[in-house]
Amino acid sequence: MADKEKKKKESILDLSKYIDKTIRVKFQGGREASGILKGFDPLLNLVLDGTMEYMRDPDDQYKLTEDTRQLGLVVCRGTSVVLICPQDGMEAIPNPFVQQQDT
C-alpha cells in the first residue's frame, strides 16, 4: 500500500473572522452567553472574555429574562455548544435564487 497522507483536521466553521468580536453562544441545556471571542480550536472549544450569561425564567426554563450575570473569562467546551452567532446580528441580502419577473 502507498503511504497514507495524514489529513489535518479542519473545523467545520471558520471562526477566525470573529476573533476579538462579540459573539453569542447557546449551549445544550438552554444556557446562553455572549462575550468577545479570544480563541478557538477545531473541536469548537471557545475562549470568551467579558462574558455575560443571560438568565432564564425560573418558572419556564426555555424563556430568557432581562437579567444577566458577569462571568468574565470563560472556556466553553465545544461538545456543549449548540449555536454560535455574531452579537451584532446578520445582514439581510436579497434572495439570489428568486427570478425577478418583468411587470
Curated annotation (Swiss-Prot):
Plays a role in pre-mRNA splicing as component of the U4/U6-U5 tri-snRNP complex that is involved in spliceosome assembly, and as component of the precatalytic spliceosome (spliceosome B complex). The heptameric LSM2-8 complex binds specifically to the 3'-terminal U-tract of U6 snRNA. Keywords: Acetylation, mRNA processing, mRNA splicing, Nucleus, Ribonucleoprotein, RNA-binding, Spliceosome. It comes from Mus musculus. This is U6 snRNA-associated Sm-like protein LSm7. InterPro entries: Lsm7, Lsm7/SmG-like, LSM_dom_sf, Sm, Sm_dom_euk/arc. One of its GO terms (molecular function) is RNA binding. Belongs to the snRNP Sm proteins family. PANTHER family: SMALL NUCLEAR RIBONUCLEOPROTEIN, U6 SNRNA-ASSOCIATED SM-LIKE PROTEIN LSM7. One of its GO terms (cellular component) is nucleus. It is found in: Nucleus. Component of the precatalytic spliceosome (spliceosome B complex). Component of the U4/U6-U5 tri-snRNP complex, a building block of the precatalytic spliceosome (spliceosome B complex). The U4/U6-U5 tri-snRNP complex is composed of the U4, U6 and U5 snRNAs and at least PRPF3, PRPF4, PRPF6, PRPF8, PRPF31, SNRNP200, TXNL4A, SNRNP40, SNRPB, SNRPD1, SNRPD2, SNRPD3, SNRPE, SNRPF, SNRPG, DDX23, CD2BP2, PPIH, SNU13, EFTUD2, SART1 and USP39, plus LSM2, LSM3, LSM4, LSM5, LSM6, LSM7 and LSM8. Its main location: nucleus. GO terms for biological process: mRNA catabolic process; mRNA splicing, via spliceosome; nuclear-transcribed mRNA catabolic process. Signal peptide: none annotated. The modification N-acetylalanine is found at A2. The keyword Heme does not apply. Residues 10-90 form the Sm domain. SUPFAM superfamilies: Sm-like ribonucleoproteins.
